[in-house]
């Protein structure tokens, strides 16, 4: 007997795992935790599906998880184009021991067991799955893998996937699925009660490396003894394991600033951090997306780091729209929000190391700001950028030496 769609949706209404207490003020990221981690201290295993997109802009979820993952032990990446190669070497020219395989069967052979999770690692502009993608996810479910998806198309709204989850006794996690509208918060202005510096990592385009730069900066300052909290605003950083987060582009626009403000306030009250770093999305100048505006409104940053890809001529997935200049983006950000750009970070796509270093020197002279590339240059350049802008951070770093 087929179970009704209404009953299926009721069963799977909660696509995040709830805490034992029902405090409505708890951040969504604290509630979301893979089932295997909820009941088992061992980090669960996962494979990432990224066919024909690994190391490309639409493969940014897979790219991010290969570089950094707190929630999962990444066992392999599925992309037949690079099968047999090392994921770290393909992505960053540095081997990391994560193999790339051609299909699910090879991933299982490589892992010598069925992984706990199948992560859909592609982030298409449409936010939707193709028919082939759906068949592959259903196949993974039939092999007893739980599913993690960061798309706007929610699998838990599809009776086909709900029935499969019951049939195979697996879970589905729609990372972008927002809270009930009655639980959403509007902006209150209490963000100004947050006394520690708040740095937003913004950019001149989407899929530019803002999350990577924010993560590297958070890790480095934390390793120096500072208490630094990264506020995640996109699906990849939530999947990576950020504790405080909101998938901002899935929140109704009226509540975007308030939801981000609420998460920052909770991080500040719970953690008493020295510094809060906010992951940026898209670009304030981008004609297709508005998330950057909500990030500036909701976080009211005391400083902005701007990421730019000098060799990118047109906006990602928008070949008719030229990239903005660094100067115009800085002017727009500083006009739109009561903040200042404290430094520039580069995405070195299409550039040699020598070209990157040359442009760093040129931009430093042109803008009078600290300029670096978080992936190819010494990470100390990032910490210097922050310490130069915020004397209290410089003092705390000096105390920790």
Residue positions per predicted region:
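Phosphate-bearing ligand-interacting subdomains
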Residues: 100-143, 147-157
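ATP-dependent carboxylate-amine ligase catalytic core
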Residues: 3-4, 12, 18, 24-45, ...
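Walker A (P-loop) phosphate-binding motif
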Residues: 186-224, 228
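Extreme N-terminal, non-catalytic leader segments
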Residues: 136-198
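Conserved catalytic-core segment of NTP-binding enzymes
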Residues: 153-155, 161-162, 180-182, 189, ...
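C-terminal lobe/tail of nucleotide-utilizing enzymes
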Residues: 46-49, 53-55, 76, 87-105, ...
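Short internal beta-strands
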Residues: 73-81, 148-151, 232, 305-308, ...
């Amino acid at each position: 007997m087929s179970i009704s769609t209404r009953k299926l949706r009721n069963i799977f209404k909660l696509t995040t795992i709830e805490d034992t207490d029902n405090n409505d003020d708890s951040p969504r990221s604290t509630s979301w935790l893979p089932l295997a981690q909820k009941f088992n201290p061992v980090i669960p295993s996962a494979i990432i599906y990224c066919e024909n997109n690994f190391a490309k802009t639409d493969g940014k979820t897979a790219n991010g998880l290969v570089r950094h993952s707190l929630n999962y032990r990444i066992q392999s990446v599925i992309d037949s184009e690079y099968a047999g190669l090392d994921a770290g070497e393909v992505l960053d020219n540095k081997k990391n021991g994560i193999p790339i395989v051609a299909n699910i069967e090879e991933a299982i052979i490589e892992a010598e067991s069925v992984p706990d999770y199948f992560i859909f690692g592609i982030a298409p502009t449409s936010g939707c799955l193709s028919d082939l993608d759906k068949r592959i996810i259903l196949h993974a479910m039939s092999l007893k893998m739980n599913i993690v998806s960061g798309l706007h198309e929610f699998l838990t709204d599809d009776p086909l996937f709900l029935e499969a989850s019951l049939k195979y006794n697996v879970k589905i996690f729609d990372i972008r699925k927002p809270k009930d509208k009655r639980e959403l918060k509007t902006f209150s202005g209490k963000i100004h009660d947050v006394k520690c510096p708040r740095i937003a990592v913004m950019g001149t385009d989407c899929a530019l490396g803002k999350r990577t730069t924010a993560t590297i900066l958070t890790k480095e300052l934390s390793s120096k003894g500072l208490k630094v909290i990264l506020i995640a605003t996109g699906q990849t950083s939530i999947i990576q394991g950020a504790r405080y987060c909101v998938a901002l582009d899935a929140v109704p626009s009226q509540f975007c600033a308030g939801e981000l403000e609420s998460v920052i306030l909770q991080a500040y009250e719970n953690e008493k951090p020295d510094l809060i770093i906010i992951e940026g999305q898209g670009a304030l100048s981008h004609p297709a997306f508005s998330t950057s505006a909500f990030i500036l409104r909701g976080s009211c940053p005391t400083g902005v780091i701007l990421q730019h890809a000098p060799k990118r001529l047109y906006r990602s997935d928008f070949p008719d729209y030229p990239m903005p200049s660094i100067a115009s983006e800085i002017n727009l950000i500083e006009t739109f929000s009561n903040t200042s750009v404290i430094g520039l970070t580069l995405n070195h796509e299409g550039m040699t190391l020598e070209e990157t270093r040359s442009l760093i020197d040129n931009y430093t002279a042109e803008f009078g700001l600290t300029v670096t590339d978080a992936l190819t240059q010494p990470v100390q350049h990032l910490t210097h950028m922050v310490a130069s802008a915020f004397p209290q951070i410089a003092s705390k770093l000096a105390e920790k030496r």
